[in-house]
């Protein structure tokens, strides 16, 4: 079992129960899933770019990504409905906790000019979204084999009812918020 999951059960639950005066352990917010999304708009011209992006996402997450397709045609972007334009992975359970631990301890500190993550990126329901400009911050990606630097979106979905509860949950994991 991931260390962070044990830490959540042993420390975070008790801390949040006293902070928010919950009656039951089941009321305490928890991390439900982590979604990684990589939009590859250039895949319209070159299909190989999408394969490389999917390989990067597989290395980062340890799970095969789902190829996302355009929902509707947009002439300005030169895409048609059904064109493959990106890939995404939804992590749950053990893989989610392992990725979350790597994200906090290894990947985020490797971001260039890092001063902390914005605490305003919550969606109103306790879920946190962040963008990463380059995939090379993850140790699984070999810098020499990268054909193109791509960014990705990371969404941490929690069972929190409000942004305040979600922020407290992530802060309990020492999430590096900007002061």
From Swiss-Prot:
Complex and partners: Part of the 50S ribosomal subunit; part of the 5S rRNA/L5/L18/L25 subcomplex. Contacts the 5S rRNA and the P site tRNA. Forms a bridge to the 30S subunit in the 70S ribosome.
NCBIfam families in the record: PRK00010.1
Family: Belongs to the universal ribosomal protein uL5 family.
Transmembrane segments: none
SUPFAM superfamilies: RL5-like
GO molecular function: RNA binding; rRNA binding; structural constituent of ribosome; tRNA binding
Reported function: This is one of the proteins that bind and probably mediate the attachment of the 5S RNA into the large ribosomal subunit, where it forms part of the central protuberance. In the 70S ribosome it contacts protein S13 of the 30S subunit (bridge B1b), connecting the 2 subunits; this bridge is implicated in subunit movement. Contacts the P site tRNA; the 5S rRNA and some of its associated proteins might help stabilize positioning of ribosome-bound tRNAs.
UniProt keyword annotation of Nucleotide-binding present: no
UniProt xrefs under Pfam families: Ribosomal_L5, Ribosomal_L5_C
GO annotation, biological process: translation
Superkingdom of origin: Bacteria
InterPro entries according to UniProt: Ribosomal_uL5, Ribosomal_uL5_bac-type, Ribosomal_uL5_C, Ribosomal_uL5_CS, Ribosomal_uL5_dom_sf, Ribosomal_uL5_N
Cellular-component GO terms for this entry: cytosolic large ribosomal subunit
Keyword terms of this UniProt record: Ribonucleoprotein, Ribosomal protein, RNA-binding, rRNA-binding, tRNA-binding
Protein name: Large ribosomal subunit protein uL5
């Amino acid at each position: 079992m991931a260390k962070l999951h044990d830490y959540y059960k042993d420390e975070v639950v008790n801390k949040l129960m006293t902070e928010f005066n919950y009656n039951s352990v089941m009321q305490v917010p928890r991390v439900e899933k982590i979604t990684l999304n990589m939009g590859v708009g250039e895949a319209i011209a070159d299909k190989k770019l999408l394969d490389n992006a999917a390989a990067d996402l597989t290395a980062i997450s340890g799970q095969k990504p789902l190829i996302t397709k355009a929902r509707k045609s947009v002439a300005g972007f030169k895409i048609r409905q059904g064109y493959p334009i990106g890939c995404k992975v939804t992590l749950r359970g053990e893989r989610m906790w392992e990725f979350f631990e790597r994200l906090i301890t290894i990947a985020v500190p490797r971001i260039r000019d890092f001063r902390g993550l914005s605490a305003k990126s919550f969606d109103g329901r306790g879920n946190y979204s962040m963008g990463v400009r380059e995939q090379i911050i993850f140790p699984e990606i070999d810098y020499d084999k990268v054909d193109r630097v791509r960014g990705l979106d990371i969404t941490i979905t929690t069972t929190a009812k409000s942004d305040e509860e979600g922020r407290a949950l992530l802060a309990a994991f020492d999430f590096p918020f900007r002061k």
